[in-house]
């Protein structure tokens, strides 16, 4: 069985079809604008911005778009949007808990779109706090194995604040407190270990095992939510079979 982290990592490696690439670009640009607004336009002194830029470049977002997003976010160019972060909570098929992260300039529009998408795909909204307690905010770094053992990775990050290293199959997941994420990332780089992504994420404390049919319904719901313009990320506490994961 595989959890959300392995599913998200597998999905990240798949090519994004043209119909969805525009939405992906928009989400990546939003992240850059917000990071520049909060921490300033210099990625050397703003690790959140540096990570947002790296993710955008990994998805082939043009450099000009990236630079303009930085300037807008930092107030150096007109046209910046005052994005508001919101987290919605809900349940999917099989009782799976969902945290839905949004960045929006219209709270009412975001709430309506998320609620409609949940209802149409077998989900339901939940009251604030009724789902969030099932997740912990963690720093998550995904490291491709590339011939390395779990002990190799653990040795590189243990003194940097890493809490654990999990085997995801083709990669390792390094977990830390959010405040230690930059130190963990830098420790990997110093050891010559490449990482695929470094994010602050919601990690479930308990996973719900799903049969294959329910798992497919949950993944369809998450995909529909991720297609919403205001939704940046969706987190869920499920275990699904490797057979269903292979269909992603």
Curated annotation (Swiss-Prot):
<dbReference type="InterPro" id="IPR026564">
    <property type="entry name" value="Transcrip_reg_TACO1-like_dom3"/>
</dbReference>
<keyword id="KW-0963">Cytoplasm</keyword>
<dbReference type="GO" id="GO:0005829">
    <property type="term" value="C:cytosol"/>
</dbReference>
<keyword id="KW-0805">Transcription regulation</keyword>
<dbReference type="GO" id="GO:0006355">
    <property type="term" value="P:regulation of DNA-templated transcription"/>
</dbReference>
<dbReference type="InterPro" id="IPR049083">
    <property type="entry name" value="TACO1_YebC_N"/>
</dbReference>
<dbReference type="Pfam" id="PF01709">
    <property type="entry name" value="Transcrip_reg"/>
</dbReference>
<protein>
    <recommendedName>
        <fullName>Probable transcriptional regulatory protein Acel_1346</fullName>
    </recommendedName>
</protein>
<dbReference type="Pfam" id="PF20772">
    <property type="entry name" value="TACO1_YebC_N"/>
</dbReference>
<keyword id="KW-0238">DNA-binding</keyword>
<dbReference type="InterPro" id="IPR048300">
    <property type="entry name" value="TACO1_YebC-like_2nd/3rd_dom"/>
</dbReference>
<keyword id="KW-0804">Transcription</keyword>
<dbReference type="InterPro" id="IPR017856">
    <property type="entry name" value="Integrase-like_N"/>
</dbReference>
<comment type="similarity">
    <text>Belongs to the TACO1 family.</text>
</comment>
<dbReference type="GO" id="GO:0003677">
    <property type="term" value="F:DNA binding"/>
</dbReference>
<dbReference type="InterPro" id="IPR002876">
    <property type="entry name" value="Transcrip_reg_TACO1-like"/>
</dbReference>
<dbReference type="InterPro" id="IPR029072">
    <property type="entry name" value="YebC-like"/>
</dbReference>
